[in-house]
Amino acid sequence: MCGRTACSLGAARLRRACAYRDRQGRRQQPEWLREGRYRPSYNKGPQSSGPVLLSRKHVQQDADSSERVLMDMRWGLVPSWFKEDDPSKMQFKTSNCRSDTMLSKSSYKGPLLKGKRCVVLADGFYEWQQRGGGKQPYFIYFPQNKKHPAEEEEDSDEEWRGWRLLTMAGIFDCWEPPKGGEPLYTYTIITVDASEDVSFIHHRMPAILDGDEAIEKWLDFAEVPTREAMKLIRPAENIAFHPVSTFVNSVRNDTPECLVPIELGVPKEVKATASSKAMLGWLKSSQEGSPQKKEDTLPRWKSQFIHSPSPKKSSAGILRQWLGQEGGPPAKKQKA
């Protein structure tokens, strides 16, 4: 399953990170719709809003279906046929949608057959491993290149070389209040059986679209029929992960500390270190619109971590570089 994500890039950088090639081979950046509503977060849960990619044709009928737009939508699908005047009155959870049942449930089948496919964007997602009497959170994401995001210029037209966003297959819908009012756009994340590498953490994972060709096929509902698009919904192998502090357990905690790699089996006190202060300084200067915390309000906590076998994949060292955490514990070399 997928019940918590992080998406910390500011709106302008998020747009750059989603650049793609159009049918003529030209680099394009998707236009933001309702950009002012987007709020970056290191700890995003269901019912919060998050960024998604969709075909422009959904909002502009005469548009080319291969064109993409960015929109901020609420996490947890509210079907267009929902009759209550308050979407919070829904009595079932729709933050995740199982791939094996989505064509048998009306909440998902309707929008899916209408081509309402979207790509949910995130730095990565959190998943909890249940072991013994406790749960150990992990952060799961795409393997990263070694270029530091701080080198990226905000208004650069060059290819994005910062953090590679995790791109998850989703379904969206638009609900209109029965008594009138602003339409509500919502989404759900499709889940599949976990790949072998992450099955020790949880038996389910998001359906991850690896590469622009997969993203293009999933979004272009006018050219790629549902049956063909469904072939993209499968477990992903090209992923990395590392354990993180139980600080992330509370959705109220929304700082970079949520992402920082930890070593299992080691009691660790996390506080406002010099490196974390430098990290926050970089985030303030380079990520417009990102969550900002005063240095003296950084959390301080102690956790006893459950010992478990080391993960098979990790880009933890690169994440520390991204967060300015070079002073943290060294990442162990692990099999790819």
Swiss-Prot record:
The keyword Zinc-finger does not apply. GO terms for molecular function: DNA-(abasic site) binding; peptidase activity; protein-DNA covalent cross-linking activity; single-stranded DNA binding. Formation and reversal of DNA-protein cross-link depends on DNA context. Catalyzes formation of the thiazolidine linkage in presence of abasic sites in single-stranded DNA. Mediates the reversal of the thiazolidine cross-link in presence of double stranded DNA. GO terms for cellular component: replication fork. The modification Thiazolidine linkage to a ring-opened DNA abasic site is found at residue 2. It holds the Pfam family SRAP. It is found in: Chromosome. Residues 29-52, 283-336 are annotated as: Disordered. Keywords: Autocatalytic cleavage, Chromosome, Covalent protein-DNA linkage, DNA damage, DNA-binding, Hydrolase, Lyase, Protease. One of its GO terms (biological process) is interstrand cross-link repair. The record marks 202 as: Required to stabilize abasic sites. The record marks 127 as: Required for sensing abasic sites. Residues 29-38 have a biased composition (Basic and acidic residues). Belongs to the SOS response-associated peptidase family. The N-terminal catalytic Cys-2 residue forms a thiazolidine linkage to a ring-opened DNA abasic site. Glu-127 catalyzes reversal of the thiazolidine linkage; self-reversal is favoured by duplex DNA formation. Glu-127 is also involved in sensing abasic sites in single-stranded DNA (ssDNA). His-202 stabilizes the abasic sites by forming a hydrogen bond with the O4' hydroxyl group. This is Abasic site processing protein HMCES. It comes from Gallus gallus (Chicken). The lineage of its organism: Eukaryota, Metazoa, Chordata, Craniata, Vertebrata.
